[in-house]
Amino acid sequence: MTKSALEAELLRCGLRRYWQAAQVYVRNAVTLTAQVVDEVPFGRSHLGGAADLPLDWAWPMRGDTPLSLVAQINFADCQGFDMNSVLPERGMLYFFYDCVDGGWGSEPQDRDGFRVWFYDGDRAFLLRRYAPEGWNFPAAALQCGRRWEIPDRECWLMRDYWWEDFENVAWWERWDKFTGEKRHKLLGHSDNIQGAMELQCQLASHGIPYRAATVSQLEESFTAGAADWLLLLQIDSDDRCGMHWHGNGRLYVWMRRQDLAARDFSRCWVVLQSA
C-alpha cells in the first residue's frame, strides 16, 4: 500500500483526525507472504521447517527442550522492499521459540524462551539442520512485498492521542477489518492484540517484571528508552504452517533502533500476545 492509498483508506474509514496525528510516524513494512512447500530452497527465507545454520552452531535448547524454528530470513531477499534501508543488505536472521513454555515476554526470565541469531558470514559454511522430531513446523516459503503503515491505536507513539467515540467505532468496524489478513512482516508497526509493548520490552529486558514495576522504575528517565524499541519481526498465527500462538495470537520480535543500526541482534526481545 502506498502512502497516498493509506491516507485515502483512513479517510474513507472516518479516521481523518488520526491520520493527521499519526502520519509523521508512517513506516515501511516488508510484508512476508507464506506459501507451504515440500522443501524450501537452501538459504532462502521461510517459516518453520529446517534451519540453514553455520557449521559450528548447535540447535538451540532450553534445558532439555529443543526450541522450534519460527522463521529464517535471508536479508538479501528483502532488497528492494526495505524502502528506508534499515535492514542489513545481507546475512541470515534466525528466530527460535520455546513452543512449550516460551512465556509472554513480560518477565526477565522469558529471555530463555527464545533465540534471535544473526549470521553474515560465508554461505559456504552453512549446513541444513532439522529440528528433533516433533519440534518443527511445516515449512512455508516467504515472498517479500512492501507497504506503508500507520501506528497501531494502542502503541507507545500514540499513547497521548485522545480517541473520540466515533473513531473507536471506525477503527474496529472498518479499519481493522480492512487490514485483517495474516500479518507476517519485518519492520513497520506492530498489529497489537493486547496493547503497547515498547515499555514492556524496555522493562523486562532490563530485569524488571513488567507487571511489578515500581513507581521509581517508571520514572521518565528510564521509561524514555521505550521509544527506542522498534518492531523487527511479526509472525501471526497461521494454519498453513501449523502455527497457533496461544490460540490465535502473534509473536513480536522487538529491538532497539541503535542495536539494529549496530547489527547487534543479541538484545532483541520477544513478546507473545493473544486475544
What kind of region is each of these model predictions?
Residues 1-275:
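Preference for intrinsically disordered or flexible, low-complexity segments
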